[in-house]
Amino acid sequence: MAGYRADEEYDYLFKLVLIGDSGVGKSNLLSRFTKNEFNLESKSTIGVEFATKTTKVEGKVVKAQIWDTAGQERYRAITSAYYRGAVGALLIYDVTRHATFENAARWLRELRGHTDPNIVVMLIGNKCDLRHLVAVKTEEAKAFAERESLYFMETSALDATNVENAFTEVLTQIHKIVSKRSVDGGGESADLPGKGETINVKEDGSVLKRMGCCSN
């Protein structure tokens, strides 16, 4: 996937949010995707931070603005502003801690309570490099994703497994929604956003599911 300088022209700006319990690896997934870095000593995020990455998606230059927030309960008052304008989300759990997977349903309810119903959501089972400690079976996560019409992948921010694939898939699905609206509207629709505006995914139909997991 080709990279682009932050100051280059882009066709779309998509806001993505990372959600899930504290310690599941949200910040390291973000730094792995945007900077190809991993910090073994990363501390829990305090408040909100975001990073951007500009990349090519189906021939268009897309700038992803990716927001990361603390998973701790005491920081959840920020949710309304955090979710506002988001068109994609990565719902992340730790494959070695079943409780983080159990809490995914609550995070999903919160997300859907603050965003458009057709937001593109990818369920992420992170830390799949720790195969000997796995507490959440892939089949269990797939079943949840199917019930909730989510995409699904297992990732490792540590060794970069599926990190690029996961973010790119979410951006690709958002772009497909925007492209479909443009075609259905007879070309350049007046309600399609310009540079720097938020993409609204309101008019999309059912979300298809794509499964992915760590290779053995």
UniProtKB/Swiss-Prot annotation:
Induction: By auxin. GO terms for molecular function: GTP binding; GTPase activity. One of its GO terms (biological process) is response to auxin. GTP binds at residues 20-27, 68-72, 126-129, 156-157. Keywords: Cell membrane, GTP-binding, Lipoprotein, Membrane, Nucleotide-binding, Prenylation, Protein transport, Transport. InterPro entries: P-loop_NTPase, Rab_GTPases_membrane_traffic, Small_GTP-bd, Small_GTPase. Pfam families: Ras. Belongs to the small GTPase superfamily. Rab family. Plants overexpressing RABA1A show reduced growth of roots and shoots and smaller leaf sizes. This is Ras-related protein RABA1a. The gene is RABA1A.
